[in-house]
């Protein structure tokens, strides 16, 4: 089993000598029975002091990933204006879940905040998923985050029935 590797890419703030890395999920992502806990540093954006070779901070989007939600895009370095016209240098990460992480480059704090949302437990014997995952309010997700029966394909009756049966048998 592995931890979060540099999966999505790397960006560097040359002036501050900070490296930003988006990480993958802990292997094997579909089975977390033998890797208990949050699997720190996986599914994260981390900041590393290049000169001193030290971790400055990490921000984990998904804890104990069993859904293949690694951060597959490289971090984007930019600046935004927030409260009272204050300019903040940020690192932005777009994720497979449709979230856009906007983090302070120096602290790793999420600029817009989040809430912790209770999530369903796994039905896999021995699997201990995190009880809560982060739910980001802003920026609004750029992709749909919930799938229900109304979303099943209607391209053909055969396809619709096939997917409906698959979902029914998983419940």
Predicted region positions:
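Beta-sheet-rich non-transmembrane sensory/scaffold domains
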Residues: 1-171
